[in-house]
Amino acid sequence: MSDAAEAILDAAGRNVIAVGFHATTVDAVARDAGVSRATVYRVFPGGRADILDGFLAREVERFFSDLYDHVRDLNDLEAVLVEGLTYARSRIIAHPVLNVALVEDSSVLESTFSKTIESITATIAEFVTSYLPTSPHRAERGDFLARMALSYLSAPGAWDFADPAQVEALVRSELIPSVSSGKRVSKVRPRPLPKAENTTLQQRVARALQKEFVSGGSLSMESVARSAEVSRATLYRAIPGGRWQLVGATVEIETARILSAVAAGLNDARSLDDAVVGSLTTIWHHAATHPALTRLLAVRPDLIHDQMRFAKAQRNFEVFTAQMAPLLARWVGREASERVAEWTLRVMFSYWLDPAPSLDVTDPASVASFYNRHLAAGVDALAALPDQRRVAAVLGKRH
């Protein structure tokens, strides 16, 4: 990278820290870097967007390089994962730029991550795989660990990464459980979606929008209102905002239908293993075959990816876990049910948004086999964890 480019990116960093991403301008960056606007546009033809992309890409590269330097001399995988996750989370929180992005608007990181996440995942997978024993699924396991590690760095969920005991429990249960379960859970058929209703205005709008969206229509407010047989004014009152707000509302309705199908499966499950396998099978099947969701992932993947990273992912994990966990509590305690539900959702989103050659999310047999290889032992370990909130309550009463 040229000296001019480095100076411009350094200036961009100072501006971001001072005024935030949205208030950073080309003029301010040029003035801070001591160069002309013409020089800025010669080095970064795309202007502000290129500058911020280049700056964030550099910061992300430096972040992971620093993380690698911190763990590369450790001798075993558990130490690598515990120390690496703890250090990385603390660095994200303390990082003057990444923290600004997370607080202000994590969507500014989406372009950078969409361009670099594949190479970052592959690099982490290669590193952790070197610690794994030789086995038929060694590379696949390394990829799984890399995916999970990046997911925790983005959104820790219910795990407190400032508590060393919790990080160790996470690693020993979800990532490298000490004892293989030896179980072979059978495949579970996906549950059908409940019938799509048209009794409310929101449901009619959702049906109309899906029709327009899937068919490749203009997706204008006029066409959606016409298809839903309502006026534009009524449409705006029901779902304020533009067309992508309509898409978001439709996704929420369809997500609720998928969760209803999951709940039906959980009610009929005979064991915790059946419950998790059935939930993954049902969610993956509908997420991968639903016409509106598949088209949205094809034309605006950023809208979905952005919801599954950083603060937005944290919020979504909390919402979805709160809906799923109570249905798992008949097998395990409340805290364990929340851990299992969150992990199930974390795995589901990772392999739906970034498919792996080792898993066909639409094939129940493939899902069950994946569960047996990567999740069964971890679910057992999570179920065996003590309920820390209950322990704390008991200790509090004693004192």
Question: Which residues does each predicted region cover?
Answer:
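Amphipathic alpha-helical segments used for helix-helix packing
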Residues: R89-K115, H286-A313
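HTH DNA-binding helix-turn interface
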Residues: A18-F21, Y41-L52, F213-S218, Y236-V247
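Amphipathic C-terminal alpha-helical segment
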Residues: S90-A94, S130, L145-A162, S173-G182, ...
